Amino acid sequence: MSVVPTLVPPPQPSLAPGEALVLWALRLGAAQPANGPLIDQELSLAYGPLDGPPAAGALARLAATLERHGRRKLRLAHPAEAAPTPDERAVLLLLAASQARDWALRDALLLWLVRPAGRDAAARAALALGAALDRGGHALPLARVG
């Protein structure tokens, strides 16, 4: 059996491991949509064969909703970049608010990020991704993002 090296960069000191994983996957998917299978593989390695695919699906749905219904094109950094952009911070905070069930903050971020037609879909995807991250032991910090 051969070992498949992981391509996920190690967590940066300023980012929680879950934050680093989400940013890497969002950035890699945006940089090259053909990287979907690689992202699926990495999330399956991180969360296991049962929780990895739902996490990958929720991430793909959130990314697609943000792309299709975003108020504007999000600014994402290169996948290996350490620091999150302001838009990436907003997405991480959206996920943290969804995990914490802080509906007021989640709704405020949805108003900022997504046009009305996509808000329900973005809310469902953020909740699903937040739950998948929770099951994998990655609670995102609500007080400090990035």
Where are these regions (language model features)?
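Polar/charged low-complexity regulatory segments
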Residues: M1-G146
